[in-house]
Amino acid sequence: MEDFVRQCFNPMIVELAEKAMKEYGEDPKIETNKFAAICTHLEVCFMYSDFHFIDERGESIIVESGDPNALLKHRFEIIEGRDRTMAWTVVNSICNTTRVEKPKFLPDLYDYKENRFIEIGVTRREVHIYYLEKANKIKSEKTHIHIFSFTGEEMATKADYTLDEESRARIKTRLFTIRQEMASRGLWDSFVSPREAKRQLKKDLKSQEPCAGSPTKVSHRTSPALKTLEPMWMDSSRTAALRASFLKCPKK
């Protein structure tokens, strides 16, 4: 699974996921299913945000050009992917500026058009079950919830899906592709079933020995985005930086 994640996702997303797991004392090499889930969630958050801007009249528009008009403002502020301290700093700043109620839990995005925080969910289970779990945890009508599944289903607060159909279809297609690629490598069942995942983990740990096999070649170059994470979310260059992550996973 770890090899799959490093092949399938944009290196920047992989680095952010590793950083997030280490912040909570988790090891991406051991908790590989969680590693894959975090990368998937990060990518969906970025795809949700990408190409969406607000023009000078306050209208939401979609711009896929790499160099949008300077008067355009990103519609979504990405909170997911930052370290906790910076994430709360961004949330506090938004609340102070917009007078929106501060959430109890860190949300994933802020929508400047609808003036609301958004919680994004990606589930391997039934969307309505995961939606209820999220709503139960958040306990706030102010935070908008949008759940996607790997089967193309989705569910959102008051059936308000925020994005246009084409943007949502792009996300669903990517999730379906990830599922298909996992299945083709025999990884999907363990990704869905915790019991199967534990069995696979024991098997993997048993087979791991020092110097066993050749290590996978991975680029360890630090992404410029990680050095300047804060301004990156505000700059239009993020579209180009993340576009590669929308591509189909390479076959082995």
Swiss-Prot record:
Pfam families xrefs: Flu_PA
Compartments (UniProt record): Host cytoplasm; Host nucleus
Family matches, as InterPro entries: PA/PA-X, PA/PA-X_sf
Residues flagged as site, Important for efficient shutoff activity: 202-203, 206
Record has Lipoprotein as a keyword: no
Keyword line: Decay of host mRNAs by virus, Eukaryotic host gene expression shutoff by virus, Host cytoplasm, Host gene expression shutoff by virus, Host mRNA suppression by virus, Host nucleus, Host-virus interaction
Residues the record marks as active site: 80, 108
Residues of the site described as Important for efficient shutoff activity and nuclear localization: 195, 198-199
GO molecular function per UniProt: RNA binding
Any one GO BP annotation for this protein: viral translational frameshifting
Region named Disordered: 202-223
Main location: host cell
Domain notes: The probable endonuclease active site in the N-terminus and the basic amino acid cluster in the C-terminus are important for the shutoff activity. The C-terminus acts as a nuclear localization signal. The C-terminus is recruited to host protein complexes involved in nuclear Pol II RNA processing.
Function: Plays a major role in the shutoff of the host protein expression by cleaving mRNAs probably via an endonuclease activity. This host shutoff allows the virus to escape from the host antiviral response. Hijacks host RNA splicing machinery to selectively target host RNAs containing introns for destruction. This may explain the preferential degradation of RNAs that have undergone co- or post-transcriptional processing.
Family to which this protein belongs: Belongs to the influenza viruses PA-X family.
Protein's UniProt name: Protein PA-X
Annotated organism of origin: Influenza A virus (strain A/Duck/Germany/1949 H10N7)
Highest classification ranks of the organism: Viruses, Riboviria, Orthornavirae, Negarnaviricota, Polyploviricotina
Name of the gene this protein is made from: PA
